[in-house]
Amino acid sequence: MSKIIELKNVNKWFDKFQALKDVNLEVNQQEKIVICGPSGSGKSTLIRCINRLEEHQEGHIVVDGNEISEKTKDIEKIRAEVGMVFQQFNLFPHLSILDNCTLAPIWVKKLTKKQAEEIAMENLKRVQIDDQALKFPGQLSGGQQQRAALARALCMEPKIMLF
């Protein structure tokens, strides 16, 4: 099986604080892994570096055969293949859950509204909140918001999912 994510000696500092120290990791296609650790141990920093939302200072990160660095030219194309659910769910409060899930597929993937809504409803059903599709984020519990954020990421049909 081929590698979809590869990290070699990845280091990241915030001023004098080293958030990531010599991280080495290989993830194969279709493989599911869990990175666990206490608060402040660098888990979120690591996934933000994989998606180039944070810059790593040393080492190599390769995602689906593309090295991720300041020289990466088509980072948006790579990001379109990497779904991400943030600690703060970042749902748009003024949009329904359904609209939160259809926005990126319509704008980025150029799907029709009908196509995007069908995919969104499939994914909302997958995370068991399809009955909440017309509600707004503030009307859902924290757990439901997390599932809505996961469904939203799945609507882009990513090769890789980080959360």
Model-derived segments and spans:
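ABC family nucleotide-binding domain
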Residues: K3-F163
